Amino acid sequence: MTSFEIVFYKTSNNICPVKVFLLDTDIKMRAKISSLMEILEEYGNFLREPYSKYLRDGIFELRCQSGNNISRILYFFYGDNKIIMTNGFIKKTNKTPKKEIELAKLRKADYIERMMNK
């Protein structure tokens, strides 16, 4: 099985939204998310529910729960083995907010464009 590498998306002004999100979460949630990221690196696109779910347009969500708090980190696959983490949020409803998916899609397009121009 191919091992995967997690890459944190950075904005054009070098801000890493997922790292900012992680710093804002409590320590238990952060630890759970970190463990799930390790599992994702190992299993990549073979990881399924309850840990990972395909949403649409190449966007997936990493699913984490700690107590009553539910977190999601959206990501996509790039190249042979890269997992690009685009944004994270605390989930308040059963459905993943459309604005979060749209943000992930915008960041995916931005990332791919910047990689093509390297």
What does each model-found stretch correspond to?
Residues 1-70, 79-82, 92-118:
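Basic, Lys/Arg-enriched alpha-helical interface segments
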Residues 86:
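Conserved catalytic cores of phosphodiester-cleaving nucleases, focusing on short active-site segments
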Residues 89:
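Residue-level signal for short, function-critical loop segments
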